[in-house]
Amino acid sequence: TLVLQAPDKKYVYVVGDFNDWTPKADYQLKQDGEYFWITLSGLIKGEEYAFQYLVDGSIYIADPYTDKVLDPWNDKNIESTTYPNLKPYPTGKAEGIVSVLQTGQTAYNWKVKSFERPAFDQLIVYEMLIRDFTEEHTFNAAKEKLEYLKNLGVNAIELMPVNEFEGNTSWGYNPSFYFAVDKYY
């Protein structure tokens, strides 16, 4: 089920891979006050679907609560080694940032179940911007440097924002998609 809060709007459609990016009656969201919602059916478990909301017939927006976006301006800068098999942007069908929906995602299985954090007065915190911490600008490259930080006495890492934001040069404090981790990392 998709839900969009859109106060003072008259109607909303969802357009995407599942309906050839065409606003159709079956894909008009039902209104409940300032919320619009729809339950999609017939989606293939595990397949990614790009989509946007079409608001009042003229405003195309991505879902602000999506966990992944496709960006026509910045995705081209992402190396395939950093993000293999990145879903291509639907060029010619959409404009601007689009959301990605995937049903049946596998839940993350935490590997460390007995984590004990250091006492508050014993914390040595390293504030890390993934983009600037290593030449590769990736989570994997940062992970390879954890032993180095440990040898410095660091016992806690505070990640600066890692979610998607407008543009590609920022500390990430201008977020636009709070639940979508920046694919550049």
Placement of each model-derived feature along the sequence:
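Glycine-rich, aromatic-flanked loop segments that form ligand/cofactor-binding clefts
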Residues: 152-166
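Aromatic-rich carbohydrate-binding modules that target alpha-glucans
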Residues: 3-48, 56-79
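Solvent-exposed loop/turn segments at secondary-structure junctions
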Residues: 20, 131-134, 163-166
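Conserved, mostly hydrophobic/aromatic
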Residues: 53, 128, 149, 159, ...
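Basic K/R-rich, polyanion-interacting modules in nucleoproteins and related proteins
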Residues: 1-12, 61-122
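An acidic-aromatic substrate-binding cleft motif
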Residues: 102-156
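Aromatic- and acidic-residue-enriched carbohydrate-binding clefts of CAZyme catalytic domains
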Residues: 165-185
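Short, solvent-exposed loop/turn and secondary-structure capping segments
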Residues: 25, 62-66, 136-141, 161, ...
